[in-house]
Amino acid sequence: MAIVSVKLTSNQVDKFLILWRPYLVHNNHNYAKYTFKIDGTLIIIYNTNTCTINTHDINSFLNTFLKREDLTLFNVIKQQVNTKKNNQNVMSQSEIYESAQVIIGSDEVGVGDLFGGIVVCAVSLKKSDFKKINHLKIIDSKKLNDQQMQEIYQQIKNQISYTIVSYNPKEYNELIKEYNNAHILKTILHYKALQSEIHKHAKYSIFSVVDAFSSLKNWNQYLQKVNFQPYEPNLLIPKAESIYTSVALASIIARVMFLKMIAIIEEQFNVKIPLGSSNPLVNDVASNIFQKFGLKILKQVAKEHFSNFQQIIKNK
């Protein structure tokens, strides 16, 4: 599913209502004027006349349900959709804030590292929060070094709302054996972090964004597998940290927390822990820990299902 946002005039909103009145559904959203559900597609028209269309295939939807009904309206929306496609087809922060008071973004760190577990952070930002953080020039964490992220975290940790959830390596290994799918573990943590922030901001209208690691279909299947209540983020999108400030901050905070997890391992074994999994130094350090302390201890600091972990214990 993808969300496309378009701006309508009052006359165009009236046309929508005439065309799709049979598809009107109830919506508790404080800022929603009309909500329609048409063959699996959700359309919300807000008080600002911003219209969001949540659908699997925007072109198919427009051609099927609008082109034959009102060609003029079809062309207006089609033009806006095509413009957005040229700009990655995503809603901007300013568009979201027209219809939501809080943007919650979540991201995870540690999934590609042999050592350490995984950390997920969800960050909530109201428009007013930007006054506190604009001077920091928040960008994609992949473009920041560890020192820069630490400095940003120290400046924002008491200024914004966020939730951190994690699995240490021992917990991670136990759950991987149970579910045999790292995506399920990530979904659990994202879900818990998002729900925590949603609960904190229950009186606000919320828009949630997750840095995508799976499709929405799989996300729902993972939640069903672990018997969690259904919840769909408003947007699952790759590289969300480069688009939405809340996700960028979530990535930074999660990275800082993951580095703290690594620092504990370093202190425990008095060794510098290399990050990643393909670096030859990773194998060297893991082999040394295995040889000195045994398999039980290695399982407490590293991800057991990684191929190099298996190779290390195989070559003992």
From Swiss-Prot:
Belongs to the RNase HII family. RnhC subfamily. Its main location: cytoplasm. A divalent metal cation binds at residues 107-108, 211. Endonuclease that specifically degrades the RNA of RNA-DNA hybrids. It is found in: Cytoplasm. It catalyses: Endonucleolytic cleavage to 5'-phosphomonoester. HAMAP family: RNase_HIII (MF_00053). Keywords: Cytoplasm, Endonuclease, Hydrolase, Magnesium, Metal-binding, Nuclease. It comes from the Bacteria. GO terms for cellular component: cytoplasm; ribonuclease H2 complex. CDD domains: RNase_HII_bacteria_HIII_like (cd06590). The keyword Hydrolase applies. Manganese or magnesium. Binds 1 divalent metal ion per monomer in the absence of substrate. May bind a second metal ion after substrate binding. Transmembrane segments: none annotated. One of its GO terms (biological process) is mismatch repair. Its EC number is 3.1.26.4. The gene is rnhC. Its cofactor is Mn(2+); Mg(2+). Residues 101-316 form the RNase H type-2 domain. This is Ribonuclease HIII. Pfam families: RNase_HII. Gene3D superfamilies: Ribonuclease H-like superfamily/Ribonuclease H. One of its GO terms (molecular function) is magnesium ion binding.
